[in-house]
Curated annotation (Swiss-Prot):
It comes from Escherichia coli O6:H1 (strain CFT073 / ATCC 700928 / UPEC). The gene is cusB. PANTHER family: CATION EFFLUX SYSTEM PROTEIN CUSB. The cus efflux system is composed of CusA, CusB, CusC and CusF. This is Cation efflux system protein CusB. It comes from the Bacteria. Coiled coil: none annotated. InterPro entries: CusB-like_dom_1, CusB_D23, HMBD, MFP_Cation_Efflux, RND_pump_MFP. Keywords: Copper, Copper transport, Ion transport, Signal, Transport. GO terms for biological process: copper ion export; plasma membrane copper ion transport; response to toxic substance.
Length: 407
């Protein structure tokens, strides 16, 4: 009986000791998980889409269908930039790109238009009064060759001057007198071929033929046989067809990239098989006040006259700048008041920096200043980081530093 009681007592004592030991070990276990989460002090909650609006408790954003994000006290720092939970940056697909140095390439097509070459333009006039004897079968739009007859006419003043010339020759007039009469005929517009014929034949001519002075297309011609013609009346207007002009309007912001004709590729929808040769180009000095564009004029060979004035054309401009600092265009934040990027420093902090933009093309932006080659900039997921920088005061510190450097 005593033995049984001793065994039971030993079991009870062992249970008490085990319970006490478990209690002691439980008290000594460090509450690591609890301190890692519960002890982080939350300053406020906010919606990244509206970072300036703060909330005192978690929940759904009243602006967007998303959970509010906590702002922790241990994230506050006087250092430049902000530090963001890597889980958040990964979930939002934050990506970075390296600032590089290289040429900014530009390639764009511009609508263009074919027109007459205004340097090849002739006006045929009657420099003395007379009347039209014959009009050759021509009209506006007809092509003529140099020397082709346009009309026959009689001009009394020319007939009278010829009579004076022949009279001087017969009466022994001096060379100076006869040459003076011939010069008067030239100034009155009598064709040189008719003057030579007068000298050779010594006979008065009463009918004269006005001819085309150049190859081209008639753009004005409205005369009929029997009509009187006054001094200085326009008989015809003729435009040359080789070369022609092709003009295009280009933005004034890319004028600095236009350097030589090798940058241009010209195509005409009406003749897609034709290879066009550009003789020379000119960037006209005037800027269109409404569109802020410059007129680019190309002089194009047109020996076969395949290019017709009024045709549509396309001008492809391919060019590149000198080496410059380049970043992806999506890395740029342009508020209208300032342009900035988010850089990543050696400690992994996101630091906003102001930049000066020079030009952008094909998804790449060239910078004047603000960054150095090799720096890292955020190219995707900018919104969260920029909002965080705004909340943490990093943007204000950036602006203060910029103002200090400016002074």
């Amino acid at each position: 009986m005593k033995k049984i009681a001793l065994i039971i007592g030993s079991m009870i004592a062992g249970g008490i000791i085990s319970a006490a030991g478990f209690t002691w070990f439980a008290k000594e276990e460090p509450p690591a998980e609890k301190t890692s989460t519960a002890e982080r002090k939350v300053l406020f909650w906010y919606d990244p889409m509206y970072p300036n609006t703060r909330f005192d408790k978690p929940g759904k954003s009243p602006f967007m269908d998303m959970d509010l994000v906590p702002k922790y006290a241990d994230e506050e720092s006087s250092a430049s930039g902000v530090r963001i939970d890597p889980t958040q940056t990964q979930n939002l697909g934050v990506k970075t790109a390296t600032v590089t140095r290289g040429p900014l390439t530009f390639s764009q097509s511009f609508p263009a238009n074919v027109s007459y070459n205004e340097y090849q333009y002739a006006i045929v006039q009657a420099r003395a009064a007379g009347f039209i004897d014959k009009v050759y079968p021509l009209t506006v739009g007809d092509k003529v060759q140099k020397g082709a007859p346009l009309l026959d006419l009689t001009i009394p003043d020319w007939v009278e001057a010829q009579s004076e010339y022949l009279l001087l020759r017969e009466t022994g007039g001096t060379a100076t007198q006869t040459e003076g009469i011939l010069e008067r005929l030239r100034l009155a517009g009598m064709p040189e071929a008719d003057i030579r014929r007068l000298i050779a034949t010594q006979k008065i001519q009463t009918r004269f033929t006005l001819k085309a002075p150049i190859d081209g297309v008639i753009t004005a011609f409205d005369l009929r046989a029997g009509m009187n013609i006054a001094k200085d009346n326009v008989v015809a207007k003729i435009q040359g067809m080789d070369p022609v002009w092709v003009t295009a309007a280009i933005p004034e912001s890319i004028a600095w990239l236009v350097k030589d004709a090798s940058q241009f590729t010209l195509t005409v929808p009406a003749r897609p098989d034709k290879t066009l040769t550009i003789r020379k180009w000119t960037l006209l000095p005037g800027v269109d006040a409404a569109t802020r564009t410059l007129q680019l004029r190309l002089e194009v060979d047109n020996a076969d006259e395949a290019l017709k004035p009024g045709m549509n054309a396309w001008l492809q401009l391919n060019t590149a700048s000198e080496p410059m600092l380049l970043i992806p265009s999506q890395a740029l934040i342009d508020t209208g008041n300032e342009q900035r990027v988010i850089t990543v420093d050696a400690d992994g902090r996101f630091v906003p920096k102001r930049v000066a933009v020079f030009q952008a093309s094909q998804g790449v932006t060239a910078l004047r200043s603000g960054l150095a080659e090799g720096e890292k900039v955020v190219s995707s997921g900018l919104f969260l980081i920029d909002s965080e920088a705004n909340i943490s005061g990093a943007l204000e510190r950036m602006r203060s530093e910029s103002a200090t450097h400016a002074h």
